[in-house]
Amino acid sequence: MAKKIVGYIKLQIPAGKANPSPPVGPALGQRQLNIMEFCKAFNAATQKMEPGLPVPVVITAYADKSFTFILKTTPASVLIKKLAGLSKGSAQPHVDKVGKLTRSQAEEIAKIKMADLTAADMDAAVRTIAGSARSMGVEVDGV
């Protein structure tokens, strides 16, 4: 018989840097899950990723105090800022443009994000990424 799910916990944790301090400790502690076990498993799973990049994770908590987790891809906004060389997006995105992306850079981000996007094909994924970039005040050439 399947385990009874008691809840889901959604967090964004830097790759390879999960530790028991907030936000991880309190979120897992509320569900009485083993915090250190999660931290070790998460750090092992994100070992090959670039250290420090935020990784969204969905933790499924079960009634027997066990858990499973699913790693998502890094948020598009973080990847856009990284490729455009920005520290933050524009305060007025449709007025002040703060950077530029080429179509090939947008395709690179779309390839990374494809698993988490609902886009039917690569062109739709690129347009989705271009829309995210525009909403941050980053121009996208060729889209």
From Swiss-Prot:
Cellular component per GO, a single term: cytosolic large ribosomal subunit
One Pfam family cited in the UniProt record for this chain: Ribosomal_L11_N
Gene3D superfamilies linked to this entry: Ribosomal protein L11, C-terminal domain, Ribosomal protein L11/L12, N-terminal domain
MF (Gene Ontology): large ribosomal subunit rRNA binding; structural constituent of ribosome
Keywords noted in UniProt: Methylation, Ribonucleoprotein, Ribosomal protein, RNA-binding, rRNA-binding
The record's account of how the chain is modified after translation: One or more lysine residues are methylated.
Superkingdom of this protein's organism: Bacteria
Annotated InterPro entries: Ribosomal_uL11, Ribosomal_uL11_bac-typ, Ribosomal_uL11_C, Ribosomal_uL11_C_sf, Ribosomal_uL11_CS, Ribosomal_uL11_N, Ribosomal_uL11_N_sf
SUPFAM superfamilies found in the cross-reference section: Ribosomal L11/L12e N-terminal domain, Ribosomal protein L11, C-terminal domain
GO biological process, one term: translation
Family label: Belongs to the universal ribosomal protein uL11 family.
Subunit architecture: Part of the ribosomal stalk of the 50S ribosomal subunit. Interacts with L10 and the large rRNA to form the base of the stalk. L10 forms an elongated spine to which L12 dimers bind in a sequential fashion forming a multimeric L10(L12)X complex.
PANTHER family to which the protein is assigned, alphabetical: 60S RIBOSOMAL PROTEIN L12 (PTHR11661), LARGE RIBOSOMAL SUBUNIT PROTEIN UL11M (PTHR11661:SF1)
Its job: Forms part of the ribosomal stalk which helps the ribosome interact with GTP-bound translation factors.
Protein name as it appears in the record: Large ribosomal subunit protein uL11
Natural source organism: Nitrosomonas europaea (strain ATCC 19718 / CIP 103999 / KCTC 2705 / NBRC 14298)
